Amino acid sequence: MKFFIDTAEIEEIRQANLRGWVDGVTTNPSLIAKSGKDFHTVIKEICKEITGPVSAEVISLQHEEMVREGKELAKLASNVVVKIPMCEDGMIAVKKLKSEGIKTNVTLVFSPMQALLAAKAGATMVSPFVGRLDDIGVEGMQMVDQVIQMYRNYDFETEVLVASVRSPMHIQLAAEMGADIATIPFKVMQSMTHHPLTDKGIKMFMDDWNKAQKK
């Protein structure tokens, strides 16, 4: 299973990469806006930090403009994946970009049918948003399981990238289901290293060691 980090912060990417946790990066306009930097500058900086896929999102909702923006983004670095919102124009853009050898990540997917359409259009990756579904009382991970099963039934090459991750349990379930990728905020990655018994055990070992040194 591949881990992507969901951030536009260079230092978070560096720290996660230092720990061996990062296979790629996902960004969106909101994350980049928080950085206060130029959009293309941020994407270039990220692509210098990591060799894996870096998802960069188009802003337009018209397919001609999506394709134009996608081509511009793809020129920034060889590992850029163009992020396209799930909509009819988006599917036209995905098909066109695929025909030109440009990889795509269809985002804002909230149903198995949307994921199926994205795969039919030729998306490289599809991003089901689990946390936002959970927020409205729908079990997000159940949708992921359905998407994975459908893709396996028909041997789609589109990778399932679990997004809108809120907790380590989302990652565990994604791994159990066989999702290809999960994109994870750095804080959630850090929380995955902890367990009350691990923390307690480390403290006990250190206390015992310090006592022994005083004898």
Swiss-Prot record:
Protein family membership: Belongs to the transaldolase family. Type 3B subfamily.
Q: Answer yes or no on keyword Glycoprotein.
A: no
Q: In which pathway does it act?
A: Carbohydrate degradation; pentose phosphate pathway; D-glyceraldehyde 3-phosphate and beta-D-fructose 6-phosphate from D-ribose 5-phosphate and D-xylulose 5-phosphate (non-oxidative stage): step 2/3
The UniProt keyword set, sorted, is: Cytoplasm, Pentose shunt, Schiff base, Transferase
Q: What is its EC number?
A: 2.2.1.2
Subcellular localization(s) per the UniProt record: Cytoplasm
What GO terms in the biological process aspect are recorded for it? carbohydrate metabolic process; pentose-phosphate shunt
Return the Pfam families for the record.
Answer: TAL_FSA (PF00923)
Highest taxon of the source? Bacteria
GO CC entries: cytoplasm
Q: What class of enzyme is it?
A: transferase
What is the predominant subcellular site recorded for this chain?
cytoplasm
The entry's function note states:
Transaldolase is important for the balance of metabolites in the pentose-phosphate pathway.
- Spell out the catalytic residues: 83
Source organism per entry reads Bdellovibrio bacteriovorus (strain ATCC 15356 / DSM 50701 / NCIMB 9529 / HD100)
Reaction catalysed?
A: D-sedoheptulose 7-phosphate + D-glyceraldehyde 3-phosphate = D-erythrose 4-phosphate + beta-D-fructose 6-phosphate
Molecular-function annotations in GO? aldehyde-lyase activity; transaldolase activity
Q: Report the protein name in the record.
A: Probable transaldolase
